[in-house]
Every structure is written in C-alpha cells, then in structure tokens.
Amino acid sequence: MDVTELEENLFAASDAKLHGDMCKELSGVLCKVLSIFPSLEGARPRSKSGIQALCSLHIALEKAKNILQHCSECSKLYLAITGDAVLLKFEKAKIALIDGLKRVEDIVPSSIGSQILEIVGELENTRFMLDPSEKEVGDQIIALLQQGKKFDNCNDNTELEIFHRAATRLSITSSRVALAERRALKKLIDRARAEEDKRKESIVAYLLHLMRKCSKLFRSEILDENDSPGSYPCSPNEDHGSVHGFGRQLSRFGSLNDKPMNSINSGQMPVPPEELRCPISLQLMCDPVIIASGQTYERVCIEKWFSDGHNTCPKTQQQLPHISLTPNNCVKGLIASWCEQNGTQIPSGPPESQDLDYWRLALSDSESTKSQSVNSIGSYKLKGVKIVPLEENGTTVVERQNTEESFVSDDDDEEDSDINVLERYQDLLAVLNEEEGLEKKCKVVEKIRLLLKDDEEARIFMGANGFVEALLRFLGSAVDDNNAAAQDSGAMALFNLAVNNNRNKELMLTSGVIRLLEKMISSAESHGSATALYLNLSCLDEAKSVIGSSQAVPFLVQLLQKEIETQCKLDALHALYNLSTYSPNIPALLSSNIIKSLQGLLASTGENLWIEKSLAVLLNLASSQEGKDEAVSSQGMISSLATVLDMGDTTEQEQAVSCLLILCNGRESCIQMVLQEGVIPSLVSISVNGTPRGREKSQKLLMLFREERQQRDQPSSNRDEPPQKEPARKSLSAPLSVHGSTPASASVQDYEPRVLSKSMSRRKSMARPFSFFWKKSYSVRE
C-alpha cells in the first residue's frame, strides 16, 4: 500500500467530526511515518538506546492515532468547547513525533534517514490552528454554560435559540445526527463517572439536556415542513430560516404561545408541558433535580423514591450507578418563564402528599402524553410510522417502516417518541402474558426482537420489567408445541435482550433458560438459534460453569463435525472458545472429542474462517496437562499446525507457533514429531516476517530445538573420542595379518569399531531434520 492509499484509508477511518483540518494534517504525516515504520523495525537495533528510541516513536504514533480517534468518536459539542485542549494535544503529538523520529535517525540506513529528515522538516513546518468558525461556536456554548448558573434571570427562549444556532453551525441539523450526538454525550458522562470527574459530568449532563430539547425541534421542523405542500426544508446554513423554524417549534412547547392565555380566558387552567412536570407527581416542579439517568424529577419525590429502597430510574427503570442529585437550573428557569407567560404562580413548594403509586402515576403521565400526541396527529405527517392493530386483539403497536425518512426507528430516547414507549412496551408485555394464541404472540415476539436489535435502553427497560420471564414462557410453549419458527423467534429475541447486558443474562440463567435450550437442541431445526443463544450466554462468567456442565458441550462439539450453515458452526466455535477460558470446563471439552473436531477444522481445505478461533481454543486446552497429551497424541494435529505455519496469515502463524511451543516444551517425542514435518524454514521465515509476538515465539521454538539437539549430541561426542586407543589399533593391525591369529585383545578391537559405527549412524539420523537449520541457505522443505 503506497503512502497516498494509506493516507486515504487512515483519514477515512478517522472521519473527524470537528477539527478536520488539523486531523488531515496530522493524518498525512502519520501515514508517512507508518509507511517507513516496518523498515525502522527491520533495522533491529541491538543497543538499549536504539530499542528505547523505537519504543518512544511507537508511543508517539499511538498518541497521534488516539487524537484522531478522539476527534472521530467524541461529541461535536464537547469537541467545540474543548478546542484549546484539543489544539494542545495536537501540538504535543507533533513534538513527540519529532523527538521520536530524531532518536531513530541514527540507527537506520542512510536511505531511510533521508526520509526521516524530510518528515521531521514537514512536522516542524506544520502549524496547527483551530477553525475560527468552530472556535466561535465553542465560545458561544461556553458562554451559555456560564449563564446556566444564573438561569433564573435568563429567558429560556434566548438560551435554547443560542444553543440551536450553535448546534446548527456544527451540522447537527437532523434527527439522526442529533441521536448520534446524544449517544456520544452519554458515553462522555459514563467516562466522567468512571473517572469521578464531577465537573465534567455536570457540564456534559447540561449539554445532553439541551441536546434533548433541540432533538425535538429538529424532528418537529421536519414534520412541519413536510406538512406544507410545496415547501422545502431550510438549509443548515440559512440561519434566518432556522431561527424562524426554531421560534415556531418553541411555541409548540407552550413557552411563548397564546393558547394557554386563551384557555385562561375560557375558564380552563393551562396544562404545563410534560418537560416541566415531575414524572412521579405529574405536577409543575418547584425544585427540579437531575439523577444519574439524565431524567429530571421533583427533589422531594425522587428522594422519597430512593428512601423506599429503589436504585433505579422511575421512568426508564435503568439501574443507577449512584443516587446523587444535581439541581436543574435550566428547567427551573423554564418553569418560571412558562408561569409568567401563562399568568400562573410559580410553585412555592413540593406536592403535599408523597404517598404515591409511582408506576401508576408514570403510566398515567404516559397516557396523557399519548392522548395529546394522538389528538395532534391530524396536523402531522408521521412518515415512517404506522399503527397496526394485532389480529384478534385490540392491542395497538407501532410498526416502523424502513424508509429514508423513518428517522424515528433509530431513536432510543423515549422523549423523542410520538407514541409513548412505556405504553407501547406494556401493550407488548400484555400480549405475551395472555394464556392463549401462540401465533399472535409469535408476531409480538418478532417485533420485540427487532426493537431490541439496536436499542440498549430498550434492553435495560424490558429486562427490568418482566420481559425475560415472559419471553422464556413463550419459548417454553414453543418447545412444547414443537413449533420451530416460534422457537427461533423466541430464542433470537432473548439473544437481542442479552446483548451487552449481563443483568439480563443472569435473569435468564436463574429463570431456567439452559433447561429450555437442552430441549431445543433435540430438534435439528432449532440448532441455529439455540447455538446463537448459547454463544451470547457463554460471554457471562457465571454462565460458563453452568453451560459447561450441561449437554451443551457435546452438542456444540458435534456441530463442528457436521455439514451445517457457516454461521451456526462459527457460533458453536466461538461459544466453545468462551467455555474453554474457564479451566474447570476443559475435562468435559476433552471428553467430547473436541481435539478431533478442531483438527478437522484446521485440516479443512478452502475454509479459513475457523483457523484463528480453532487455534485459540487449542491454546486454552493446552493450558492443562490433559489437553497437551491429547493434542500430541491426536493423529494429524501436528501436521495441521505445520500446515498453518506454511499457509496461514501472520496472526494464524503466531497462534500456531504458540501452540507448538507449549506442546514441545519438555516433550522430546513432540519435538521429533514437529521436526519430521520440516517446520524449520517456516519458523525461520516467521522469526523475520511475522508479528512481534510471532517472531518472539518462533525464536523460542528454534532455540528449544537447538538445545534439544545439543543435549542429544553431547553423549555421542564423548563416545566418538578414543585418543589413546586409536594408535593401539593401528599397531596391532600388522600382527593380525602376519601371524594369522587373533590375540586376546582382538575381541576388544572388534567391539570398538562397532560402537563407533553405531554412534556415527545415530548422529547422522538426528542431524537430518536440522539440515535446513544449520545450512546457510535452503530452498524447499524436504
């Protein structure tokens, strides 16, 4: 790959969200360094200073890569407000690269040294600067954050309008981009909590709150524009259009509209927007606070919730890492502004009674939200969303169409859903809990599977609200009815529910999922989905012992030997790898003839999909003495490993060398078997061209062979040296021929040449496998 192609690939991989010019400059230099780095490693410095110089350059390269990755994965808003810090990181990366390159200049040939000087000169002439537009946006957001502390005296319309403009200038102009931004902010919050950086956490939480507000505006703008025939969406660069759209949508939140005033005149009390009401008390908040999930509640209500022993978010049911409360001055200012606009008094205290049924109130809040949404559907065009009644039931669920405009389908934030997610999930759960109708339940389970596919919050919510038990009951009914299609749907829904969620995996284990899977694997039609679920569960440490002691082990091993779908076989192999990392499972794996199955995969022609993972499983098995013994005694295993040394890629070669090193260590018989395969040329090649770990392992294996040869040759050399007896044999040769008789010592003379001949024969036979190792050149393997 030339420098141009490498640069294109590296920068395409980074895809910087912000600071693109600086990323492009650094990426270009980084590609040039990476293109000559193999030559730098090939110089093989032997001195301590040379090795340290290479290590220093490698660290500098990693720092530069990390900066590019940071600019490609981090939140745009956070990158904007930390522009000065990012600029400093770029400068430090440049200095580190210059220093590292100068240190390796003296240990490389002059041809490479000239390239290094050229790169150093380019780096020294590089000047990193922030984009003026991006810096201006960052300053605006920082000013907004500083005003947040004084938000009681600030107009909510002004704050949201400034934030909306800033987000638009950062190209956050669609619901999809807003979703990606919210997810990036959530990751930053998690990182700040892990680092216990309270200041960073509060800043990012405030940005996330404003981002959620703007997400509604982005989506509503699209709906309004689509609702008007012949109208076109405003360009992201047209600030005037964006501001007008922003003001129009802000009115729909009830902040500056006239409808509440009309309601007052007609004798009706204005209804506060949902964002200003506590999800528990459903009343206008007096002292709003933010909890770890990002939701806002009345302080007294959420404190009562926590004092009752709960450690989850009442609205999302998300497990909370901590129960600390952060005042939400933004919402408090919005409440004050709304009360002023609608002629109502600002709440002077919390609700009088806190003896509340939290779940019922949250649900009723959802129902009121749903009612408002349904009443306003007439003025919207909800493209990408349609309401589909289930057969033989009045339950209504939402089916999302896969069109370009169905941006709602990827949004995992319940605040952005037109039809309340909580109500929708409860409808789905109600269908699953019905006594009859497996076919109807199967359709619901399929919808649940699709909902869970890419929605982490849905997994958290459903896992905490009885969906695990309901899906397991459905799967049990499908197994009892021998319904293969229903079994597949149920197993894959459970699979999606368990993805990246150990709590849901634990619930499945305690609820008897292994027992159901053992019933499923008795039918060949369900092998694919059962294997996939085994794979997912095997990622949990607590599940490895349970699965390892069940019928799953022989079942998964047998799949490796069958002609089945590639994905199913790969799932089985990956599951066995996870199980093999738990050493008490190794005896059960060996008793199921897993070594024979792995040897078959390694020896299969035309399929390289299994080699890397098969070798990884073999390495785990070889960690036990029983595994080593069986691998060495298995017919064809050593030959298969030797073939991988010849034909595999560098990663596979590294694993094969590691396997052979473990098997040969302390085993003379295994060493002879390996040498008979003629592996010396391959090992020498890997020691030069392999991965760093592969080079290290191959050199150790060659050294092991050399030590073994020296140990075997040493006794033979002692027997081959008769310094005093040799002249005696020559002096006795004449008398034997002259006198025609054999003296008493003749028997000794006759014996010694036989011993010498035998010793020479042994050394010759031993040296044959090493012929390539000791010669200066070689061409092909014997």
Curated annotation (Swiss-Prot):
Q: Does the keyword Calcium apply?
A: no
Q: What's one GO MF term for it? A: ubiquitin-protein transferase activity
Pathway in which the depicted protein is active: Protein modification; protein ubiquitination
Q: Which CDD domains match?
A: RING-Ubox_PUB
EC number of this enzyme: 2.3.2.27
Annotated keywords = Repeat, Transferase, Ubl conjugation pathway
What role is this protein assigned? Functions as an E3 ubiquitin ligase.
Alphabetized Pfam families for the sequence: U-box (PF04564)
Q: Name one GO biological process term.
A: protein ubiquitination
Biased composition (Basic and acidic residues) is annotated at 707-729
Q: What class of enzyme is it?
A: transferase
Catalytic reaction list: S-ubiquitinyl-[E2 ubiquitin-conjugating enzyme]-L-cysteine + [acceptor protein]-L-lysine = [E2 ubiquitin-conjugating enzyme]-L-cysteine + N(6)-ubiquitinyl-[acceptor protein]-L-lysine
Question: Where do the segments described as Disordered lie?
Answer: 707-765
Protein name (record): U-box domain-containing protein 7
Domain U-box, by residue range, is 271-345
The residue stretches assigned to a coiled coil in this entry are none
ARM repeat positions in this chain?
456-499, 502-541, 542-581, 583-623, 626-665
**Compositional bias (Polar residues) spans?**
739-748
Q: Does the keyword Repeat apply?
A: yes
